[in-house]
């Protein structure tokens, strides 16, 4: 009990509203620290991520053939798992701001109509994004 209380001082508790259009990141005691478009721009041929969020949104419809700006969620559920992981990784790293050495605990909002498989995909993507615990 004491150990958990001590650890909570060195980790960050976060909430993620993973939306089709926008993603919000809330950090306990700080409020909303990130509000970004849920868009990722990546290279089609090599798969590397070029931009995430607002920067990627600016690229929609303006990219050469080897770059694709896409929304990895549709109707609140994941349609591109790997791209969602890349997006969450970027957002969570920005929310951590390098002040902690422990991975954050994260609560993720999931649409009430999501199936069990869709819910599991959101939790798995969040865990793969480098958090310590996701619910």
Model-predicted segments: where are they?
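Nucleotide/phosphate-binding catalytic cleft detector across ATP-hydrolyzing
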Residues: 1-135
């Amino acid at each position: 009990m004491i150990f958990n209380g001590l650890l909570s001082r060195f980790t960050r508790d976060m909430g993620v509203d993973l939306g089709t259009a926008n993603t919000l990141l809330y950090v306990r005691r700080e409020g909303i620290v990130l509000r970004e478009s849920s868009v990722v721009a990546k290279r089609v041929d090599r798969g590397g991520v070029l931009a995430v969020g607002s920067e990627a949104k600016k690229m929609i419809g303006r990219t050469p053939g080897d770059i694709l700006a896409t929304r990895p969620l549709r109707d609140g559920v994941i349609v591109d798992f790997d791209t969602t992981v890349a997006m969450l990784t970027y957002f969570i790293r920005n929310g951590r701001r390098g002040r902690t050495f422990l991975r954050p605990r994260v609560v993720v909002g999931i649409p009430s109509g999501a199936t069990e498989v869709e819910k599991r995909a959101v939790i798995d993507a969040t865990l793969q994004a480098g958090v310590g615990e996701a619910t």
